[in-house]
A protein has these predicted regions:
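Mid-to-C-terminal Rossmann-like scaffold of FAD/NAD(P)H-dependent oxidoreductases
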Residues: 8-11, 18, 294-406, 438-442, ...
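Short hydrophobic core segments
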Residues: 16, 113-123, 166, 244-254, ...
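Beta1-alpha1 glycine-rich phosphate/pyrophosphate-binding loop at the start
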Residues: 8-87, 127, 176-199, 338, ...
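FAD-site-proximal beta/loop scaffold in flavoenzymes
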Residues: 135-159, 231-232, 243-320, 415, ...
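Glycine-rich dinucleotide-binding loop and its adjacent helix/turn
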Residues: 120-182, 217, 277-279, 501-503, ...
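Rossmann-like dinucleotide-binding cores of NAD(P)H-dependent redox enzymes
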Residues: 69, 162-163, 170-228, 308-314, ...
Length: 574
């Protein structure tokens, strides 16, 4: 046995890039193979860091720079005996010779390393508009720890009073919050008409209202055409309108796969120029694997190839590649882009697909909107969860969900993400046995309510119409618009031309309705309108209720933030 061990060939694994995917692969390989030679090349000065925490170091929430560093070259060697070389850039791959060319950035030395297995984890690079030429002192991108330190040092030294953030995705919004908390007046410039692309425009309206309520200015539908230094400030030039002057500019326009190395090596590329891989994370070249933001993935719900730049999938892919390198057979079954975001005192989260994707894939889907309290409404401090869920009509399978609120958002989105992964239907959602106590939830959890609502629609117990249908409803007397809210609620606004009958008076006042006319019912959140429709339907009235109620309609059409205290639907509080 001893002699056999001596003649066994030691496997040499070279990993290009650390952070999530590369570092995860390296550690997993060591756990599976104590004898393997593992060499990690990282272009930056940090091999494994909390890139999702970078904005919070700039904002002072994370106090110490060291907290961002998950592993160092020294700790990697001490614990895993992994040779990590930072400030080393791999500039070429020869798949035939199984070698990589390495450039030591600090010394300029160029060397060649052989490999038995190669893992590519180059990540993604920030999108910089072509109109931005060269580096400008007060213009930043945020990808690495070095970028973070540069921004942090600038903020500490120059104490900027104004900032323009080009881009309204995750990084842009997190930076907007953190700079605002530092007293910086922030303006977000967004090319599209909404922030947070994974959200549908109606749900994004809550995000818009939240940002504006905290003093963040939004310039929607605006395109950056150039950046121009102007003394101690920078002018952001727009396609339309006057330039925006600010003390600093952050480009957060998204990312694109960093695949130059793979392309030059002749590897097959996929969607958006990403590295094409199979479900074992293998590229088109033998013994070369790829993981992280640079690779294409299968969208779990639709099965289509896409790009998902999130830490969770990158870590999982690193582990899967490591398993297969060490003789296993692990598979990556796709990602559903589950994400969560803190926006001051609000949380926004999503999982699965949105309406834009469902329509592009020509799925036969429907949607529901509900506003349940995050915990029992009688327990102090209850606030609403604004939930939108998409489901497949034929199977009643959950396709996607979006939630905003002050508490309990992350818990519900994780349950729904699990439900999507398990292929759960409405019947299964309503039967989920979830933890309950008044400070945390209601006996019928919001997740259960999603199942109830979908099932009611599928069984024909109620019909619904949506906020975007309201404008097209006839106002010629051929239909009845019925508002069943309380007097106090109606006094603050109502649908034009609507008849007001509180739901508790409806049975006694049915004579005021014409049974020959379709009735379109609204309340504040959708619960009382459902109850009203059940009354009317059983009395022979053709009826539909407004999904999400007047509250959702008003929030979307007026982009008002409505995250105040919530009480059981229809109960007034003095």
């Amino acid at each position: 046995m001893e002699s056999k061990r001596k003649v066994e060939k030691i496997m040499k694994v070279v990993i290009v890039g650390g952070v999530a995917g590369g570092a995860s692969a390296a550690a997993r390989i060591r756990r599976l193979d104590e004898t393997a030679e593992i060499l990690v090349f990282e272009r930056s000065g940090f091999v494994s860091y909390a890139n999702c925490g970078l904005p919070y170091y700039i904002g002072g929430v994370i106090q110490e720079q060291e907290e961002l560093t998950l592993q160092t070259p020294e700790s990697f060697w001490k614990r895993f005996r992994i040779d990590v070389r930072v400030r080393h850039e791999v500039t070429a791959i020869d798949p035939t010779a199984k070698t990589v060319t390495v450039h030591a950035l600090e010394t300029g030395k160029v060397s060649t390393e052989t490999y038995d297995k190669l893992v590519l984890s180059p990540g993604a690079k920030p999108i910089v508009p072509g109109v931005v030429q060269g580096e400008l002192e007060r213009v930043f991108t945020l990808r690495t720890v070095e970028d973070t330190l540069r921004i942090h040092d600038f903020v500490q030294k120059h104490k900027p009073k104004t900032a323009v953030l080009a881009g309204g995705g995750f990084i842009g919004l997190e930076m907007a919050e953190n700079l605002t908390e530092l007293g910086v007046q922030v303006t977000i410039v967004q090319r599209s008409r909404q922030l947070l692309a994974p959200f549908d425009p109606d749900m994004a309206s809550f995000v818009h209202g939240q940002m504006r309520s905290h003093g963040v200015a939004l310039r929607m539908g605006a395109t950056v055409t150039g950046l121009q230094p102007d003394g101690e400030s920078v002018l952001t030039l727009l396609e339309e309108g006057e330039p925006l002057r600010a003390d600093m500019v952050l480009l957060a326009l998204g990312v694109t796969p960093d695949t130059k190395l793979a392309k030059n090596a002749g590897l097959d590329l996929g969607v958006g120029g990403s590295i094409a891989v199979n479900d074992r994370m293998e590229t088109s070249a033998p013994d070369i694997y790829a993981v992280g933001d640079a690779v294409e993935v299968r969208q779990f719900v639709t099965g289509q190839k896409t790009l998902i730049s999130l830490a969770g999938p990158a870590n999982k892919q690193g582990r899967i590649a490591a398993d297969n390198i060490c003789g296993g057979d692990s598979r990556f079954h796709g990602a559903q882009a589950s994400s969560v975001l803190k926006l001051f005192d609000m949380t926004a989260a999503s999982t699965g697909i949105n309406e834009k994707t469902a329509q592009a894939e020509e799925l036969d889907y429907d949607k529901i909107v509900l506003f349940p309290p995050a915990h029992a409404s009688y327990y102090p401090g209850a606030t609403p969860l604004y939930i939108k869920a998409l489901y497949e009509k034929g199977t009643l399978r959950l396709l996607g969900a979006q939630i905003v609120g002050r508490e309990g958002v992350d818990k519900r989105i994780d349950v729904l993400a699990t439900a999507i992964r398990a292929g759960m239907t409405a019947a299964q959602l309503k039967e989920l046995d979830l933890a309950y106590a008044p400070p945390y939830a209601s006996a019928k959890d919001p997740v259960n309510f999603i199942g109830y609502l979908i099932e009611n629609l599928a069984q024909g117990k109620v019909r619904q119409f949506h906020w975007h249908d309201v404008a097209a409803l006839p106002r010629d007397g051929s239909v009845t618009l019925l508002d069943v809210r309380t007097n106090a609620e109606v006094s603050s606004g109502r649908l034009e031309g609507s008849l007001h009958i509180p739901v508790d008076e409806l049975r006694e006042r049915l004579g005021e309705l014409d049974p020959a006319k379709p009735v379109y019912v609204n309340c504040q959140s959708g619960l009382r309108s459902y109850l009203a429709c059940r009354i009317l339907t059983q009395r022979g009235f053709p009826c539909a209720h407004l999904s999400g109620g007047y509250g959702f309609y008003q929030a979307v059409t007026q982009e008002q933030q409505r995250l105040g205290s919530i009480y059981p639907c229809g109960i007034e509080k003095a």
